[in-house]
Amino acid sequence: METGRPNLFFVGLMGAGKTTVGRTVARRLHYPFFDSDHELEAHCGVRIPVIFEHEGEEGFRDREAAMIRELTGRSGIVLATGGGAVLRPENRELLKSRGTVVYLRASPHDLWLRTRHDRNRPLLQTEDPKGKLEALYGARDPLYREVADFIIETGKPSVAQLANMVLMQLEMAGFRIDTAAASDQPANDTHS
């Protein structure tokens, strides 16, 4: 693993805001931003639903674990993980040991409102997507809590407010933040 600047990893269910908030925090910190799902799609050359269709969820999780291993081995990044990244113990261990983990927590109802029209979420292509989100929340919430250094509730705050909450929690936890760099000035974001 590279050494140097600390890493910041976002976990939470699909639709919790990991990519949106993560990208905003990365810009404020002047860190490169990565989304493990986007990186996996770029690496494979196909969208995640295609991976699910051809390899099933287990095949996707194998590829996801390899991507998590690679990305968490870097230094000074902000990473938004896929919602199911915490399902594998090895992923949880890598996240916990290689960075600070933020759990963006949202209620199943809020998640459903945010994801109900999104056809790129294979696990929600079901008769009862809201029920599926409730089941996923019940199964995964304890795993997110297990790896999280802190939890941010995403219900009402705006993206900017959530980013500020994350930065304040990081600072209170001793995360090395260059306060001049953590201003609202945009940074170059070369990663999707």
Curated annotation (Swiss-Prot):
Report which reactions are catalysed by this protein: shikimate + ATP = 3-phosphoshikimate + ADP + H(+)
GO annotations of cellular component type: cytosol
- Which coenzyme or cofactor does it need? Mg(2+)
Part of which pathway? Answer: Metabolic intermediate biosynthesis; chorismate biosynthesis; chorismate from D-erythrose 4-phosphate and phosphoenolpyruvate: step 5/7
- Which Pfam families does the entry link to? SKI
Any one GO MF term held by the record is: ATP binding
Binding residue positions for substrate:
37, 61, 83, 140
**What positions does the entry give for Mg(2+) binding?**
19
Write down the EC number: 2.7.1.71
The protein's superkingdom reads Bacteria
Tell me yes or no: is Kinase among this UniProt entry's keywords: yes
Q: Which GO terms describe its biological process?
A: amino acid biosynthetic process; aromatic amino acid family biosynthetic process; chorismate biosynthetic process
Kindly list the places in or outside the cell where this protein is found, as annotated in its UniProt entry: Cytoplasm
Q: PROSITE patterns under this entry?
A: SHIKIMATE_KINASE (PS01128)
Gene3D superfamilies to which the protein is assigned, alphabetical = P-loop containing nucleotide triphosphate hydrolases
Q: Which residues does ATP bind?
A: 15-20, 121
InterPro entries reported for this sequence: P-loop_NTPase (IPR027417), Shikimate/glucono_kinase (IPR031322), Shikimate_kinase/TSH1 (IPR000623), Shikimate_kinase_CS (IPR023000)
Co-factor binding details: Binds 1 Mg(2+) ion per subunit.
Provide this UniProt record's keywords sorted from A to Z. Amino-acid biosynthesis, Aromatic amino acid biosynthesis, ATP-binding, Cytoplasm, Kinase, Magnesium, Metal-binding, Nucleotide-binding, Transferase
Q: Describe its partners and assembly state.
A: Monomer.
- Job of this protein: Catalyzes the specific phosphorylation of the 3-hydroxyl group of shikimic acid using ATP as a cosubstrate.
Q: Which HAMAP family match?
A: Shikimate_kinase
Entry similarity comment: Belongs to the shikimate kinase family.
Name the UniProt record assigns to this protein: Shikimate kinase
Source species: Cupriavidus pinatubonensis (strain JMP 134 / LMG 1197)
Question: Source organism lineage?
Answer: Bacteria, Pseudomonadati, Pseudomonadota, Betaproteobacteria, Burkholderiales
> Gene encoding this chain?
aroK
